[in-house]
């Protein structure tokens, strides 16, 4: 597991490159929603890199400085890598209105979490609005959410598709975020974070 935790971010970058290559290859034949799907996967990869490495330190804000609970390297890897893999499966098998609603919901959630909730927490605790993940949330996920919404409105999905999209969005969020922490969160977890990243100079 230690080996995988040391390389999974780079594996994610490789997956992002594959997604972009598929986008270029199929640009002319794909409709707007299918084109947005690989961009959403790529945005997630960039988002994870911002949270973990550039500048990193998302865990420090999320955990209140605790290096391994409730979020550890293991739980957050499972959360993010599963999302990247699921998104890539959607790209490979063809995005549609239902999967696009899921991606719209996730994009909107990232904007809300980093742009509002964690921004407030970071301001309250450290006196800064920025939190790791905020830049990609606002510069990548926010435009994607708007584009998904615009093209979904143009596509006019049926009520059944909208409801299924909402249900699947809840399921994906539960499976990728809630379950890993429910089953893998451990105050004694050896998979701890060590670098406060952005908060290195702000931490007491």
Which sequence ranges carry the predicted segments?
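Terminal transmembrane helical module of multi-pass membrane proteins
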Residues: 142-204
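Early transmembrane hairpin module of multi-pass membrane proteins
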Residues: 28-82
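Juxtamembrane "helix-exit" motif on the non-cytosolic side of transmembrane helices
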Residues: 24-26, 93-94, 115-126, 151-154, ...
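Central hydrophobic cores of alpha-helical transmembrane segments
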Residues: 39-42, 102-109, 159-171
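Membrane-proximal helix-loop-helix units in multi-pass membrane proteins
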Residues: 82-144
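Aromatic-anchored segments of alpha-helical transmembrane domains
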Residues: 44-49, 107-119, 169-179
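Membrane-interface helix-boundary motifs at transmembrane edges
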Residues: 23-36, 92-99, 151-164
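Hydrophobic transmembrane alpha-helical segments in integral membrane proteins
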Residues: 1-15
């Amino acid at each position: 597991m230690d080996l995988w935790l040391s390389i999974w971010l780079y594996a994610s970058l490789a997956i992002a490159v594959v997604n972009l290559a598929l986008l270029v290859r199929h640009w002319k034949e794909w409709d707007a929603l299918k084109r947005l799907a690989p961009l959403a996967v790529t945005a997630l990869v960039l988002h994870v890199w911002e949270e973990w490495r550039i500048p990193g330190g998302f865990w420090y804000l999320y955990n209140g400085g605790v290096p391994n609970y409730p979020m550890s390297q293991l739980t957050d890897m499972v959360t993010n890598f599963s999302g990247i893999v699921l998104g890539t499966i959607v790209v490979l098998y063809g995005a549609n209105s239902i999967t696009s609603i899921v991606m719209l919901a996730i994009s909107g959630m990232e904007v809300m979490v980093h742009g509002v909730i964690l921004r407030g927490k970071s301001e309250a605790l450290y006196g800064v609005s920025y939190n790791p993940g905020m830049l990609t949330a606002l510069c990548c996920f926010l435009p994607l959410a708007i584009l998904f919404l615009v093209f979904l409105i143009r596509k006019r999905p049926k009520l059944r598709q909208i409801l299924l999209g909402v249900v699947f969005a809840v399921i994906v969020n539960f499976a990728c975020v809630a379950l890993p922490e429910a089953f893998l969160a451990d105050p004694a977890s050896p998979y701890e974070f060590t670098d406060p990243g952005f908060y290195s100079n702000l931490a007491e």
